Amino acid sequence: VAKIGIIGLNGAGKSTLLKIIAGIDKQYQGEVVFSPGYSVGYLEQDPKLDPSKTVKEIVQEGVQPVLDLLKEFDQVNESFADPDVLEDPDKMDKLINRQAELQDKLDAADAWNIDNKLERAMDALRCPPEDQNVATLSGGERRRVALCRLLLQNPDILLLDEPTNHLDAESIDWLEQHLQQYPGTVICITHDR
């Protein structure tokens, strides 16, 4: 686990370096290699967000795998009322086993508190109201929403291009504490400490 700061003059290529590490910029000589299974998350200076979505929908993308598990868990539970399942012990056993697998995954992901987790993250970063359409957000508000989504994804390697831009002092303090405790690697370009 490393916390790395990239410093340099304007135009020196700091943002380009992060894009290369993130796999976005392919116009270079050399090779970036990650161990298999590592996830990389990248916050660019001007995040591209789907303008047709709400703030909450964008933030939820950060925990989409957990939301998908919850949806499947609900579908499995609804299947217990299916007459075909009730009459077939093999189908019932398969359903019970799948329910147990999903329950274990959901417990491990603390999925039962996902709404609270989303709300806390959005509050900490002073995100706009959850029902606000992304198309109406300012550049700074879009960055807050994108940062919130990225932090909820919890990637192994976090690439941050000036993450404190457009954040107030309280949000910067929260972010600094969060990054100090972050369990993965953080590579950051910033003009703050």
Segments and roles (model prediction):
Residues 1-193:
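ABC ATP-binding cassette signature C-motif
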